[in-house]
Amino acid sequence: MGYEKPQIRSTTVIGIIRDGKAALGSDGQMTLGNTVMKHSTRKIRSLYQGRFITGFAGATADALTLLDRFESKLEAYSGKLDRAAVELAKDWRTDKYLRRLEAMLAVVSTDKALIISGTGDVIEPEDGIVAIGSGSMYALAAARSLMKHTTLSAEEIVRESLQIAADICIYTNDHIVIETL
């Protein structure tokens, strides 16, 4: 029996574009193994002069490293989201150090939503909803239903989706932070 490194599990991040407006939110829980370490971790950031909001899931230090790299790519490519995401993904796949990072990013603007995965993939969901993290599938299901059957705003859908995920996923809490564009 050897020492097993505790797995960092945390979070639900969901972003939505609706009616020319975008919202991205996350819960605040950070869990190490089976212990809640923090209830109010901030996992979303506004980037590039407030034109984009990004959120992260996974190992916090890894995610912050990727977030910093992504912000640098946005600056280098004058805020061109697709180009910055693809260039980050290329680096992620080819750099020995980055390849070992365990994190994902979700990014929204008023007209585009992307997921940059832990394998270096760039995914643009066709419904304008991005969700990452341990409770992402619960939040995604809730958001899709709310988008289809209500007239709620992007921010309201994000809030309700995160609350539903928090009610189901043990790695998601109800300390919700949302930013909008």
From Swiss-Prot:
UniProt keyword Protease, yes or no: yes
Keyword Cytoplasm found: yes
PROSITE patterns: PROTEASOME_BETA_2 (PS51476)
Enzyme class: hydrolase
Main location: cytoplasm
Molecular function per GO: metal ion binding; threonine-type endopeptidase activity
Substrates-to-products reaction catalysed: ATP-dependent cleavage of peptide bonds with broad specificity
InterPro entries found in the cross-reference section: ATP-dep_Prtase_HsIV_su (IPR022281), Ntn_hydrolases_N (IPR029055), Proteasome_sua/b (IPR001353), Proteasome_suB-type (IPR023333)
EC code: 3.4.25.2
GO cellular component: HslUV protease complex; proteasome core complex
One Pfam family this sequence matches: Proteasome
Biological process per Gene Ontology, one example term: proteolysis involved in protein catabolic process
Residues reported to bind Na(+): A166, C169, T172
Domain of life: Bacteria
Activity regulation information from UniProt: Allosterically activated by HslU binding.
Role summary: Protease subunit of a proteasome-like degradation complex believed to be a general protein degrading machinery.
Family (UniProt): Belongs to the peptidase T1B family. HslV subfamily.
PANTHER family: ATP-DEPENDENT PROTEASE SUBUNIT HSLV, METALLOPROTEASE TLDD
Xref: NCBIfam families: ATP_dep_HslV, PRK05456.1
Protein name: ATP-dependent protease subunit HslV
Organism: Chlorobaculum tepidum (strain ATCC 49652 / DSM 12025 / NBRC 103806 / TLS)
Upper taxonomic lineage: Bacteria, Pseudomonadati, Chlorobiota, Chlorobiia, Chlorobiales
